[in-house]
Amino acid sequence: MLIFSMLNDKRTRENRMMSEQREDLGFDPDALRAKYREERDKRVREDANEQYIEVKGDFSHYIDDPYLDAALEREPLTDEVDVVVIGGGFGGLLSAARLREAGVERLRVIEKGGDFGGTWYWNRYPGAACDVESYIYLPLCEELGFVPKEKYTHAPEILAHSRAIAEKYDLYSNACLQTEVTGMEWLEDESRWLITTNRNDAMKSRFVVMSNGPLNRPKLPGIEGIDSFKGHTFHTSRWDYDYTGGSSEGGLDGLKDKVVGIIGTGATAVQCVPHLGESAKQLYVFQRTPSSIDVRDNTQTDPDWAKALKPGWQKARMENFNTLVSGGLADEDLVNDGWTEIIRNLLTMVNFSEAKLNPLEIAQKLELADFQKMEDIRARAQEIVDDPSTAESLKPYYRQFCKRPCFHDGYLPTFNRPSVELIDTQGKGVDKITEKGIVANGKEYELDCLIFATGFEVGTEYTRRAGYDLIGKGGVTLSEKWQDGIKTLHGMHSRGFPNVFIIQNAQSAFTVNFPHAMDEQAKHLSYIVDQCLGSNIQTVEATAEAEDAWVQEIVKLARLGQQFQESCTPGYYNNEGKPNLRTVQNGPYGAGANAFFALIKGWREEGSMEGLELN
């Protein structure tokens, strides 16, 4: 989002106080800047993303599927289809749905889970819910004649909706569930991809859509002694209800006599900690960096409102939301929630429509608006949490978009329970894990159960996160080509890997409503596949010139926000506090999602498939 690239322009360091009036603000901007730097610096680690452990080998049980009733038995496949879609989450479902709408019949989805749903198949922890309004987050609602039950619906309904999409578009009939891709090789003589799997499949496909998902591979912290704990342990994305009891709605009765520790205080922990606090005999929450916690105010869907929706309602609502959170203007705020309020507050401070401000003054006012909002977030923690020390530890000191903002009405009150204790590590993380529990701040906390709410790999190699590599033209692998940074056209095509389409945020659109971007990419790739199938085009790939130009454009635009990311507290947005040229190149399209959507739509309408080499 371009609006945030201005928040830390170099020029804001010059004469910052030109338009600041401390007596009117209620806070000291210089003091906050110093506090933000102090909090950031204590959290920066030299090992950045290397601080995390790859979940394999002795740690592979953390990614076992706990939701399978029985393992699926089938014979290996050696057939051929027109399109293979790798991944059964929203990106894969949308790609397959749009391909079906384009008339593609010989299509197969390969999914490692036991069903469709992607992140919503795996993340069934108590309290799991979408943090973007469900009426725009759940894809293809109009196509299915469906309206979610809540403004921010919970995981069971999202998973059920995923299954309904697969049913509507007949994706189960030829799907390979409980199947992991192990490799892909381009067969030059046949113009086909050979796809191998852990079930000894060796199938061929003319086109491949890679939709592995941005948050699909759990990560573990590289804490000393992580493999020594003798109690029960699991990752939140593989919640063990056999141990905890209860369901995604809570009621974790199995923990009533258990002392539980949870490492992590990001978006997942914010949703599940209230249920753990309600059920566990004792809960210790180990925190490195607090999340910003704003009001959620979830509501049930009004049946009369749902019945009155007119054709095109979801598309209009999605586009309206994306315009507003990208800093654009609209006559009406259809979603009108915490996300759009953030941007509305920023724009109100700047008042673009009336004030004649230069870029320096705009940057200053945006920064002040951000300060004010985060002051409100910190005041909310102070107001809700009874213990002053705990309240202070729960206050985030960084710009609001340094980390994904959280919205929840039950997280902060949980720390008023006598059985819940926040263990703030002052940015250092826990010291070590022992046979009995966790050592933090020099003190050992004995536990019966240890839960990792430590998120997913984001900044690691794409092929590592995917779990397989591609061998393209001339025997070059994708990992070799991308070793110094991602190289694509529109984030989707990479030269040397014909007929492959990649659904991702990198070098593509980023919006807080991920499925919207995925759908625009799905429409784009389905158009190209349809053109190829209808015109007997055997191969399609980016030209070298178009790919180079796109990478240069990505880097140029990304530099607008680089100063902002460098000032942020460590997280997956900024390579754990170590942004570099590679992370800049691997970033999204810096002009914003709306500009990207318009760009690829215009590309399709122009009709010449510029930048692609067709054979």
State where each predicted segment sits.
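Hydrophobic/aromatic ligand-binding patch that stacks against planar heteroaromatic rings
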Residues: 275
